[in-house]
Amino acid sequence: MLSTKTLPSSKAQESLQSPTKGSYWITTFGCQMNKADSERMAGILERMGYKQAEEELQADLVLYNTCTIRDNAEQKVYSYLGRQALRKKLFPQLKLIVAGCVAQQEGESLLRRVPELDLVMGPQHANRLETLLNKVETGQQVLATEELYIIEDLTTARRDSSICAWVNVIYGCNERCTYCVVPSVRGKEQSRTPPAIKREIENLANTGFKEVTLLGQNIDAYGRDLPGTTPQGRKKNTLTDLLYYIHDIEGIERIRFATSHPRYFTSRLIEACAELPKVCEHFHIPFQSGDDEILNQMRRGYKIKTYKKIIGRIRELMPNASITADVIVAFPGETNEQFQRSLSLVEEIGFDQLNTAAYSPRPNTPAALWPNQIPEEIKIERLRKLNSLVEIKAKERNVRYKDRVEEVLAENTNPKDKQQLMGRTRTNRLTFFPKVDNQGNSYKPGDLVKVRVKDIRAFSLSGVIEN
């Protein structure tokens, strides 16, 4: 149990603010799917009349949308909950909610551990937030973790950006990777229909959005659960078909998608990305390990030669494409030779960026029970070596941008320099540039700007506007 039996000291009480009635605060942990879910839940709260608080300790409804991919993310949630449990002792009107994957995984045990919680809700219940809150208002402590079919959400999301939007197209995951909890907490794959997706993107375009990122745990598995096949025997509604279907929506300048699984990244999809002008040349395709035996133990369903073939075809058709990925080091039983194969793959492919992690045992996954766990000190050392190589290769990849003119979609003012805008290239490189060009023309978020790159860093660029 996180809460204490006694109230905080008078001095501590003075440091805690009384909640502002009708205000909310959402803290999001983890992946882009969680960010999209949080935007939808914020939209529901604002439809109900809530206003976003200026800071977390002012809110009288606090929601943590949680991630359980790694243990450190989960533990961070509990530290946040301890602070809010303290507030709830002083301000009983505070509503305290845990949503997302920790909620789904822990369920009733989370309510026992943190009895101050009003609502524990899994990710499949994000669209039901209003219904669940109405139950909370009657004095109930609510648990919502049962599996259900995700109905189309008619709520307007409260977007964190007015330029770029996340659009969920497939929920859940049918894979059974031995290290991953996602299938157990997000349920089986459920694809939205193409017309529903198109309507959402059209609405975004009508309100000024310029870029959409299609989201899915395995985005390229989209449509496997939808009916219909072509005369050639393939599924009728694939991600490739969806890209063609939404491509010509007026007002949308750019289309991205994430995250891809190598098993479903077809040649037809690569060719469509090369053909369709709005689809950006950035592909996030996790490889997880550079060793075939480890991939087999992970139950990933492909070999490294398949992965290399995918990257080769992308670079053949789109030479300037950026490739990013996820990789795990120190998976149970990983030898030094197997780890070296991951380093060799990073060296060979030259990723633009990698999300790196040391293996973290997760509850209810096969790999967590295996006896050959890697000692912590070896995990740390392997991760250090990998991160060092990643930074070197990222800098090498960025050299190609030097003095090149790139199309950048301006997204925001640079918070560290109000005279600069920041945005991303088509290849997803964060880029900083002046708001005003050398002829006195001003630019704003939402503008597509030609920027000549002058300075390069490992993970960002800066330059001047090209007239």
From Swiss-Prot:
A GO molecular-function annotation: methylthiotransferase activity
InterPro entries in the record: Elp3/MiaA/NifB-like_rSAM, Methylthiotransferase, Methylthiotransferase_CS, Methylthiotransferase_N, Methylthiotransferase_N_sf, MiaB_methiolase, rSAM, rSAM_horseshoe
EC main group: transferase
Cofactor note: Binds 2 [4Fe-4S] clusters. One cluster is coordinated with 3 cysteines and an exchangeable S-adenosyl-L-methionine.
GO cellular component, one term: cytoplasm
EC number: 2.8.4.3
Localization (cell): Cytoplasm
Domain of life: Bacteria
Limits of the MTTase N-terminal domain: 22-138
SUPFAM superfamilies referenced in this protein's UniProt entry, alphabetically: Radical SAM enzymes
Domain Radical SAM core: 159-396
Sequence positions that bind [4Fe-4S] cluster 1: C31, C67, C101
Reactions performed catalytically: N(6)-dimethylallyladenosine(37) in tRNA + (sulfur carrier)-SH + AH2 + 2 S-adenosyl-L-methionine = 2-methylsulfanyl-N(6)-dimethylallyladenosine(37) in tRNA + (sulfur carrier)-H + 5'-deoxyadenosine + L-methionine + A + S-adenosyl-L-homocysteine + 2 H(+)
Cofactor (UniProt): [4Fe-4S] cluster
All copies of domain TRAM, residue ranges: 399-467
GO BP term (any one): tRNA methylthiolation
Function field: Catalyzes the methylthiolation of N6-(dimethylallyl)adenosine (i(6)A), leading to the formation of 2-methylthio-N6-(dimethylallyl)adenosine (ms(2)i(6)A) at position 37 in tRNAs that read codons beginning with uridine.
Assembly behavior: Monomer.
Name of the featured protein: tRNA-2-methylthio-N(6)-dimethylallyladenosine synthase
Lineage of producing organism: Bacteria, Bacillati, Cyanobacteriota, Cyanophyceae, Synechococcales
